[in-house]
Amino acid sequence: MPSSFPEYISNLNPKPLSTKEQIDHNQAAFCIMKDLNYIDNHLVALKQLQQAEQIAIGQTDSNFLSYINAMIGRSYQQLGLFDNAIQQFQDSIENSFEAKQYYNVENSYKELVTAHQPQGTLAKLKN
């Protein structure tokens, strides 16, 4: 049985996690689930996701952190905080580089472009 939802959807042969990592994954997943309850209140959702991000930092499954970064970026984007959104999408991409075959890299690039467009800064992304 896969050890976490993000790992399950991105890796057909997930490696087992230590007990501490499993607890951290569960706590972060709980924060994400709480976030989904506040999907229309992006400030509350952002707080839940930032808690999940702090739990995920330093774990061996960096793709989990990448997933959280992308969700935070989407919340910032909905709040009109495009610079913060851009940074989160860039962090998401950076945290996914060691696992390029995972689904989140493509999504993060798409979100990064979408975040740059309203500001007219898409040319920065191309450099």
UniProtKB/Swiss-Prot annotation:
Superkingdom: Bacteria
Protein name as it appears in the record: Uncharacterized protein RC0135
